[in-house]
Amino acid sequence: MMAEPEFTATGVRIGKRLRSLTRAGEVRISDGRLRLLTSYGSEIDSAPVQAVRASRPWFAPEGRASADLNGTRYSLTLGDRDPAPGQPGPPSARRFIEAVRRASGRGG
């Protein structure tokens, strides 16, 4: 039985360097792993969440985060704030970074 994901965000733009990999992908933390998925659900990359570095580039807009997986840096465009309950759209970049820290046991 699969555990409920600790964090899931849909509608996330995922890029690598200057290339967009998917405009409406999914970021999911479950079973101790962070997965980056395309809008069709195929895996772009995944890594144990302890090995992932998630941060907010200081010069980037509020909704942006970066995630380093397996030596590759991905740029993630989430929301600049959490959507209202029942509203579509990805959660905030800050919530993603907190979720990575919490899931990897680095405090929350």
Which role fits each region the language model picked out?
Residues 17-62:
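Phosphoinositide-binding peripheral membrane targeting modules
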